[in-house]
Amino acid sequence: MIINAKGPASFAEKYIVRSIWENKFPPGSILPAERELSELIGVTRTTLREVLQRLARDGWLTIQHGKPTRVNNFWETSGLNILETIADLNPEGFPVLVDQLLSARTNVSAIYFRGALRHNPETAVEILARIHGMEDSAEAYAEFDYDLHHTLAFSSGNPLYVLILNGFKGLYSRVGRYYFSSAEARKLAMDFYIELEKLAKRHAYGEVPALMRSYGINSGKMWQKLKDAMPADINQDPHG
């Protein structure tokens, strides 16, 4: 098992998570005792204990006082916060994960974009005004796109959408910078922003779903053209 890590705790965390992912510690099984596991991984028991607590908070493990530590089925117990980890664990499946991420984001964003234009159209108009002086670069578009979604999610009347977006953030920021490196993708996005601004100024929230659906289809087609040339290391968290 080859693991790139920045310290003992990071190594231990990645070792355990990869072992769960590869079914060496299958769901429902009991982890080796603390002493045995710390020797196996090569870290102190104090470090291991901290790592186990963190993995339990993320849903990978169940820790109960006086009982052995049990491995969970993370698909049932974890949240969006493990997206980055899954991307790192499964580089071959990363393009599929991104497809699923973008599909989920498109479907959810149609709800909060409509809500924002209904409840806070002035906020939508204010942030969309930024498009008129925006630099034509991948970084500028990726940053604006995230800010737009974050602002409209918060203004939709249901701030829980912001928490969902936060779960996408790290992964989407890397994919977004790559996607918007295409001039054609930036043009497609700008056309969408301009139309959305028109709707916001007219408070025409009822027309948002059709616009979102059209942009979702077109940007999806654009992504299919771009994804085969994705950089090999785009799945890796630069901070992990």
Swiss-Prot record:
SUPFAM superfamilies: GntR ligand-binding domain-like (SSF48008), Winged helix' DNA-binding domain (SSF46785). Residues 6-74 form the HTH gntR-type domain. This is Fatty acid metabolism regulator protein. Residues 34-53 bind DNA. Multifunctional regulator of fatty acid metabolism. The gene is fadR. InterPro entries: FA-response_TF_FadR, FadR_C, TF_FadR/GntR_C, Tscrpt_reg_HTH_GntR, WH-like_DNA-bd_sf, WH_DNA-bd_sf. It comes from the Bacteria. Pfam families: FadR_C (PF07840), GntR (PF00392). PROSITE patterns: HTH_GNTR. GO terms for molecular function: DNA binding; DNA-binding transcription factor activity; fatty-acyl-CoA binding. GO terms for cellular component: cytoplasm. The lineage of its organism: Bacteria, Pseudomonadati, Pseudomonadota, Gammaproteobacteria, Alteromonadales. One of its GO terms (biological process) is fatty acid metabolic process.
